[in-house]
Amino acid sequence: MRLILLGPPGAGKGTQAQRIVDKYGIPQLSTGDMLRAAVSAQTEVGKRAKAVMDAGKLVSDDIVIAIVSERIDQDDCSNGFILDGFPRTLIQADATEKMLAVKGLELSAVVEIRVEDEILADRIAGRYTCANCGTGYHDENLKPKVEGVCDKCGSTHFKRRPDDNRDTVKTRLQAYYKETSPLIGYYYAKGKLHSVDGMAEIDQVTAEIETVLSGL
């Protein structure tokens, strides 16, 4: 099961991705995490990435694709994976398709989580994570079972992203609609796109996604 979750900031991709990970045992692959791991392990592509970053430049698409390719060759991806935050552009999406095809693989599905902009602002402003394990929470609709204690690891330390506030939501959404939303049409044309109502209760969104996945 090889998946991509699409949706604007605050749509709930992280929450739903973690539920898929827990149920199906496939890893959630973040480009940031993969990049740091490749640099730390000093893989060939990791060394290329480090040289670019040390020069103060942005890592190119071809290096990112190479890092993703290297990561999905690992044993824990043998039954599938979830791509988190990637691809972001049509160029990256096309390169990802070609990279998978070389391996004899293809995406199983692309799940779009749809949420209206005004709801996103409320969601983003209220979310926070466990500083220890990264489990996500929300002030209103996803609180820890015991106040101040992480459900997953028991930590009492939490943090909020500096850009998780109403002032930056508009800018982040504009960037999403300009760069990433064209992927919706791209994957629809390929017959891979499945849209779910991200404005429903969290468990209902999970149920809708499960309906999609069970039909693959």
UniProtKB/Swiss-Prot annotation:
Task: Tell me the residue numbers annotated for binding AMP.
Answer: 31, 36, 57-59, 85-88, 92, 160, 172
Entry-linked InterPro entries: Adenyl_kin_sub, Adenylat/UMP-CMP_kin, Adenylat_kinase_CS, Adenylate_kinase_lid-dom, P-loop_NTPase
Task: List the catalysed reactions.
Answer: AMP + ATP = 2 ADP
Matching entries from Gene3D superfamilies are given as: P-loop containing nucleotide triphosphate hydrolases (3.40.50.300)
Q: Which UniProt keywords apply?
A: ATP-binding, Cytoplasm, Kinase, Metal-binding, Nucleotide biosynthesis, Nucleotide-binding, Transferase, Zinc
Pathway(s) per entry: Purine metabolism; AMP biosynthesis via salvage pathway; AMP from ADP: step 1/1
Q: Where does this chain mainly localize?
A: cytoplasm
Q: Which domain of life is it from?
A: Bacteria
NCBIfam families membership: adk, PRK00279.1-2, PRK00279.1-3, PRK14527.1
Domain-related comment: Consists of three domains, a large central CORE domain and two small peripheral domains, NMPbind and LID, which undergo movements during catalysis. The LID domain closes over the site of phosphoryl transfer upon ATP binding. Assembling and dissambling the active center during each catalytic cycle provides an effective means to prevent ATP hydrolysis. Some bacteria have evolved a zinc-coordinating structure that stabilizes the LID domain.
Q: What is this protein called?
A: Adenylate kinase
User: Which gene is this protein's source?
Assistant: adk
